[in-house]
Amino acid sequence: MLRINQRLLVRSLRDAQYQYLKSTALRFLSSSTQSNVETTPRRSGRLFELNKEYTGKLAQPDGKANIESLYNEFKNDLDKISEFSNGRQGMAPKYGRSRSLSFINRLFQSITNAKNTSSLDPYVVLEQLSKYNLIGPAQYEMILRYYLLVKDAPKDVISLWVKYLEQFTTSNENLMAYTTIAYLKLPDMNEPDCSMLQQILQTERFHTDIPFGRIISIVEQNEVLKRDQELSNRFAYLLNLYATQNKTWFINQLDICYTESRLRSFYNIYSAQRDINNCDIEIITKFMEQFNKLNANSSFPMQVFNEYKDKLSDADGFKLKLGLLDIVSKYPAPSKIQKLQRLLAVWNSYLKPEFGKVGIDASLAYASLIKALNTSGNIEELQNIWEKEIPTEYKNNQVVFEAFLLAIIRRTKITYSQIQNRIDATKFGKLKSVDLAEAIALKIFNENPNDSKVFDDFYQQNSLDSFGSNTSILALKTYGDYIYKTKTDDETYVIANDVRSKVLKLKPQISTQSWKQEVNLILEKFIDIAPSIIPVRVLFEQRGIYQLNFTLQKKILFSEFRKPDGDVQNAEKIFEELMKTDNNKVSQPMRINSPQLMGTMIKGLCQVIGRTHDVSLYPELSKYLEMLPGLEVHMSINWMEQVLRTIRMVFRSGSTKTIPKELLEFSEFIIEKLPAIDPDFNYQFRNDDIAMFKKIGAKSFSKLKSTST
């Protein structure tokens, strides 16, 4: 197989770039001139007949044993129907639309398997079938994986990537991930070079980034790669280097980590080679914030805080402590009084003693305290502290004032005119806080649902366009368009198409992959800011026009539980629709995603029960848990914690003098039936939970395995 040394690599990539430009020109020319070598319908039909015939032969008991002879026969038959005899030497028949032939896919699956015993060389097969235009990204993915994981030949992987670039004009995240791993495994490397890797991956050409998230997934799923310490060290170095050069991008990557395990992987890799005395405090606090966002009960934010708190400069340490204040405000507690006590302990122990030190901005501390008191629900204490304890000089600070005004808008009944009067009295001018702009705009939408003038004036006065491609501002503008355009004669308004237009207007040169990612992020924020479930349902109904990604589907599903006018039964209908294909069978992709969808259902219903104390919903929760075996999903500790939390909240609410029958039956279900539903799930109950089940009246409470309280 051809091997490319690093000295020739850049030249090869330039050649690939030339081929890309050349193919673009050829496609333009061919749009007006019909090629003489187009495959005729008859020839295409014969190709599919061959595919069906040889797929059947390969499926026979002796098919894999005879794979070499089958392939040679298939190739001979291809030659018979090819157009090489037309005198156009070197021009292959255009089977480009047939790159997903099942026989070729299964052929590559077999010959790139670690247990393959045939003499067929995957590279030779790829070369031969490329002449017929029958090789696509899927086959390249299999062969790159083979040379990386089976053959441990990183230079060959890079050679194949260059060959792919010569043939195709679109990027492929999996191929880029395999190529990056191969680059990191090159034997003659000292330290990874970001610019060199970006040239190899052609990130500028494709308007993409190094696919770190995909690389992490590939490494974590392969034991050999996981145990490769040199690879781990080089990858950690590369990630740190790239994060330093592209901090905004890296923070966005943390924002789209939707599982605690993925975020933990990013943190472990980021911190592996990071000098703790030279860390980026914004990234560290972002890790804390995101861990808390994904799991409010997670102890990991405190672990991060304790790891860094004594090793930072005064200024950076102060920012870390501000992050702690935010985490504590969101951490679950039996009452808002206990949350208040925790917040004041952090304030008095960590933050107030820092005032007066060089580089310490007390206004940030007061703004953070206001935000934390608001988040924890202690609005009365917040107003008391604002009036009596915050010095006037800080009340006149725009950052502090906007934090206070945001809390007032979210926690009290205040009109838009009253809000505007407060803003006008300060003489600050344009708003700085995106969150405040969002809260005010939602107030405007609520008060002026039929006239866009007030919103348009507010938008212009504060120059919200100056925030550029800010996700929240674009989502806000989209929600405004939804509110006002759907109430006019514009019946063709499509939410996702509107967002796409906004993104492409701001970034006309953006790649398809990148604009789709931005559109999805804006739609996620659109779902978050929508105060009602109605626009979210409209977005779901329009999914046939714009394909919603899996994250959006989960968010739409969860909105039925989270929005005040959401409906549990409608959530169940959406769940059923997402899980079914046209023939009403669960598809393979949805089997892979079903744990996350099921987790969304469990989390959502638990939140509704905890919020409403509606014990009539417990049978529904039992039904969800009983569905797990049929979906091939296992119970998780995180789900169990959420379930137990709802039981505690209802039990301690004291809303009824007697224990509700539904609560008793559900408690018995958890103790008696859940172990049979998932025998592999072994949960250690806390002593106080066992005591709670006893007080509820669950007769089988003594069967529970306990751990410390």
Swiss-Prot record:
Superkingdom of the source species: Eukaryota
Question: What name appears for this protein in its UniProt entry?
Answer: Meiotic sister-chromatid recombination protein 6, mitochondrial
Q: Gene that codes for this?
A: MSC6
Function (record text): May be involved in the control of meiotic sister-chromatid recombination.
Primary localization class, coarse: mitochondrion
Gene Ontology biological process terms, A to Z: DNA recombination; meiotic cell cycle
A GO CC term attached to the entry: mitochondrion
Keyword Heme among UniProt keywords = no
Q: Where is the transit peptide?
A: 1-29
Which species expresses this protein natively?
A: Candida glabrata (strain ATCC 2001 / BCRC 20586 / JCM 3761 / NBRC 0622 / NRRL Y-65 / CBS 138) (Yeast)
Q: Which UniProt keywords apply?
A: DNA recombination, Meiosis, Mitochondrion, Transit peptide
> Which cellular compartments is it found in?
Mitochondrion
Keyword Transit peptide listed? The answer is: yes
